[in-house]
């Protein structure tokens, strides 16, 4: 195989595509990727022994093998293959990026579109330079729409992913302080995320946007094919979970979700707007949103034997931390407790942002305890003697196990592994 067209024919005839020899099935296409700690190009013989029919590799030993597409850069070839596959598709593709809420928004859009169409979508948060191509290559001939999440922690990454995915509809959820170590500044975050809208502008796609967010409004200022989020309003409720109302030209609707946190109303607005754009009936949209249950530590409410716990432990940066604390503080519950994991990739903002969080905790009424995990918090231990500090999540288990009758916010990044504390609560 010498051309991308020949490789594409091999891809279409293969039983599946794999980048892991442990998951190879008979007749699959194996793409050998090189990472920081592994190089799958050294495992070609094993891949073929396990049943691979074709392979993409930079291993010169297999350059003349007719089953092999030889290339100096297997990742770029994977991306080129995904882009070529995308070019063969005539279905709507929804692209999503943003600092916070993109995975929940992706999940909500997916369930909404799935209520009417056969929908392909990003699995989990496979939203990077490898995950986006794999998502695109998972789109089958009978799929009617696709939803593609795009993440980034360095400048230029969204532009590259959007050029591969070529979305017909796209949205940026928001912009905030995250991955500053990679982006360099908040402006760097804005410029990177805005690339999704620039891609839509270049192809005539539809830009969906939050008209309440000035940063997002600035991104689409010079574009005509824009659709603002449908208006929605929170419905006051004693329930822990979010309820809201919205209306179209004919009717008003009330939706009761399984999501914790008022900030999720924006994610729901995005899903409703995209659903309407794609022709999904309001009744189906509402039922899909009401039927969605969050997983993987995102906006979940748990009642344990001893405590009520809000679990938001998959992603943490200053803006998402503030949103979670705003929602937590607004609840009328007594005997509150926070368990927070340190935020990563903040560069020069690491110290001031963690200090801001600690100072914020002092102002929360009815806060009985604060358990802080990670060195970025612990460096301020002397200034906050009433708080408990631990270097690692495992070190906090004993303190956590003593909590009873508390209303608890468990907030951090997936790298904090705060989910390991749930059984102790």
Q: How does the language model describe each region?
A:
Residues 1-80, 84, 260, 331, ...:
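N-terminal leader/targeting and accessory segments in enzymes
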Residues 35-38, 295, 313-386, 413:
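Active-site beta-alpha connecting loops in nucleotide-dependent enzymes
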Residues 57-65, 171-308, 330-334, 359-369, ...:
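Acidic, Mg2+-coordinating active-site environments of NTP-dependent enzymes
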Residues 69-73, 387-396:
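Short acidic-hydrophobic, aromatic-tinged amphipathic segments that line or gate anion-handling sites
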Residues 96, 296-298, 415, 419-420:
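ATP-dependent carboxylate/acyl-activation modules
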Residues 163, 395-403:
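Short amphipathic alpha-helix with an adjacent loop that forms part of the alpha/beta core around
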Residues 407-423:
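Peripheral docking tails and interdomain loops at the edges
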């Amino acid at each position: 195989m010498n051309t991308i067209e020949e490789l594409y024919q091999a891809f279409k005839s293969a039983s599946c595509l794999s980048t892991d020899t442990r998951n190879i099935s008979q007749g699959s296409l194996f793409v050998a990727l090189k990472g920081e700690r592994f190089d799958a190009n050294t495992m070609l013989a094993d891949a073929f022994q396990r049943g691979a029919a074709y392979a993409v590799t930079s291993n010169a030993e297999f350059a003349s093998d007719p089953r092999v597409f030889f290339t100096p850069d297997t990742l770029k070839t994977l991306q080129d293959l995904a882009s070529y596959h995308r070019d063969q598709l005539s279905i709507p593709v929804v692209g999503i990026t943003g600092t916070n809420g993109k995975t929940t928004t992706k999940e909500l859009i997916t369930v909404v579109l799935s209520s009417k169409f056969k929908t392909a979508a990003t699995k989990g948060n496979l939203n990077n330079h490898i995950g986006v191509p794999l998502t695109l290559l998972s789109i089958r001939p009978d799929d009617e729409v696709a939803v593609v999440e795009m993440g980034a922690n360095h400048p230029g990454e969204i532009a590259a992913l959007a050029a591969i995915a070529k979305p017909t509809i796209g949205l940026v959820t928001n912009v905030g302080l995250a991955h500053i170590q990679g982006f360099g500044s908040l402006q760097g975050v804005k410029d990177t995320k805005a690339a999704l809208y620039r891609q839509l502008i270049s192809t005539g796609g539809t830009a969906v946007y939050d008209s309440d967010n000035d940063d997002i409004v600035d991104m689409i200022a010079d574009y005509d094919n824009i659709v603002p989020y449908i208006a929605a309003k929170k419905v006051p409720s004693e329930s822990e979970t979010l309820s809201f109302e919205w209306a179209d030209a004919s009717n008003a609707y009330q939706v009761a979700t399984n999501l914790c946190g008022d900030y999720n109303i924006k994610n729901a607005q995005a899903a409703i707007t995209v659903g309407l754009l794609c022709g999904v009936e309001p009744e189906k949209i509402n039922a899909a949103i009401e039927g969605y249950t969050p997983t993987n530590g995102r906006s979940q409410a748990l009642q344990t034997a001893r405590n009520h716990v809000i679990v938001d432990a998959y992603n943490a940066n200053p803006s998402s931390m503030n949103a979670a604390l705003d929602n937590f503080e607004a609840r009328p519950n007594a005997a509150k407790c926070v368990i927070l994991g340190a935020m990563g990739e903040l560069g020069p903002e690491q110290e001031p942002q963690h200090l801001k969080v600690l100072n914020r905790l002092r102002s929360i009424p009815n806060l009985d305890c604060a358990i802080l995990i990670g060195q970025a918090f612990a460096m301020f231990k002397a200034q906050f003697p009433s708080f408990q500090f631990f270097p690692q999540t495992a070190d906090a288990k004993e303190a956590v196990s003593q909590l009873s009758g508390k209303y608890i916010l468990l907030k951090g990044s997936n790298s904090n592994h705060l989910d390991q504390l749930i059984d102790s609560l």
